[in-house]
Amino acid sequence: TFIVATVDKFAQIPLNDKPAALFGITNSKKPPELIIQDELHLISGPLGTMTGIYEAAISKLCERDGVCAKVIASTATIRNAANQIMALYGRSHTQFPPQGLSAKDSFFAIQSTPEEKPARQYFGVMGIGTTATTTLIRVNAAMLFATRYLATLGYPDAVVDNFWTITGYFNSLRELGGASTQILDDVQSRLDYLAKTKFVSVYPGVDTSKGYTYTEELTSRMSNSEITEIIQVKLKRSYTKDNHADVFDYLLASNMISVGVDVGRLGAMVVAGQPKTNAEYIQATSRVGRDNPGLVIAVYNASRSRDRSHYEQFLKYHSALYRYVEATSLTPFSDRARDRGLHALYISLCRYLIENLRGNSQAINYRSDNPEVQKVEKIIIDYVRRVDPDELSAVMDELKDIQDAWDIAATGSLVYKSRKNEKKLLKGDTENDRFRTMNSMRNVDGQSGIYLLGGL
C-alpha cells in the first residue's frame, strides 16, 4: 500500500480514531515500514516544531516489536542536519550520498564542466541613483528584448522556447502586484524604446507591435485547480513561430515556485530583491535551467543594506552558495509548542494504544492511574529525554497537569469531539482551554491582538 500525505493532516490524529487502521491497530495489517519525506528543509520553524511533536506519536504507532519505520528524508538545501533530524524524528542520521574522497567525484555524482552540461549563469544588477522600480522595469524590458531577438535571428524553436517565458520571483504579493501592472505598461513602453530607438541600428528586426503581455501568476491567491493547470498544462506549451501568442511571456511567482515546479523549458528568471533566506534563493532559482542552460538576473534594491551586501559580495556568494544555507530551527518541546501540542501527543497515544479509550465516546474511561496510561506517559518521557533533555522537567510537569485535567473532565459524560452541545475533551483551536487542539497545521503561528490607545 502506498500512502501520499502532507504533514498538516497530522493534526487529525488526536481528533479521529479512523487513522488507527493506517497503523494496523484496528486490523491485522502491518504499520508503515518506510516513510519518505520530500523537501525536508520545509519542515522547519513553527511548522517543523509542531510536526516534531506529532512525529513522536507517529514513530511509536509505526513501531512493531521494537522496530521503527525507516525514514528517508530528501533535501537539496540543509545545514546542521543532525540536530534537525533528532528534533523531528528523535533519531540519529546517516547522510547519503557520503562525501567520498573527492568533491568532484563521489561515485554517485560527478561534477561536469560547463562545456559538457551548461547550467545556470547568475548576474547581479543594482541601480545607483535610480529607484528599484525603474531598475526592475529596465531589466525586464532588456530580458524581453533579448529573448525576442533570438527569434528574429532565426534560432531553432527549441532554443527560443528555452528563454521565451521569463519567470519573475518576488518576495511579497505586493511587489508582485506592482510588477504585473508594470509589465502591461512601463515594460512595454521601454521595450518599444529599445527596439525602435536605442538598438534599432545594432539589433534590428524585433517586432513590438503586438506586445508581449501574456502573463500569469503563481501565488497563494490561486486555487489548487488553477495552480495544477498552470504547472501541468499551460507552462508546458512550447514555443513555435506559429503559436507564440499562446505561450506565456511572463510567469510572476512568489515563494510558491520553490517547490514542485519542474518545467524543463523555463530558462530565464528575474529575481526582484534578495529572498529572505539563502535556501529559498537556491530553491527558487533552481526552477530555471534544469534541462537546458539558464539565466538568472538578481535585481538588488540599493536602499536595502542586505541587498547591497549581496551585490558587493556577489562573486564570493555565488561561488559557494550552499555554504551560506541557514541552519533550521526546531524546538518541539519548547514552552509554546507544549501549550499547543503536548496534550495532542498524549491523547493520540492514549487513543491509539489503549483499546477502551479509542472510540469518540470512550474519553470518559480515562484514569491516570491505569497502568496502560502510565506506559504512555513513560513513552513520551523517554522520547523527550532523547530529543530535548533540557525540557524534560517541564514536560513532566505539564503531563501531570494534562492528566489531572482529563481525570476531572472524565467524571461526567465526555467525548473527544462533538459538534453538538455534548461535553467534549478536545476544544477548538480558537478556544481558551488547556485542550484547545489544532484542526490543521497550515497556520501554526499564534496570533496576538494589537490595541491602539487614543492620543498615542
Predicted regions located by residue number:
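Conserved C-terminal RecA-like helicase domain
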Residues: 1-2, 100-107, 154, 159-160, ...
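Conserved interdomain linker/interface between the two RecA-like ATPase lobes of SF2 helicase motors
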Residues: 79-87, 92-186
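Non-catalytic terminal extensions of ATP-dependent helicases
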Residues: 184, 209-212, 216, 228-248, ...
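Conserved segment of the helicase C-terminal RecA-like domain
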Residues: 287-321
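SF2 helicase catalytic motif II
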Residues: 8-12, 21-64
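A short beta-strand element within the Helicase C-terminal
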Residues: 257-273, 294-298
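Conserved helicase ATPase motor motifs in RecA-like P-loop NTPase domains
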Residues: 39-47, 57-88, 98-99
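Conserved two-lobed SF2 helicase motor
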Residues: 2-14, 243-258
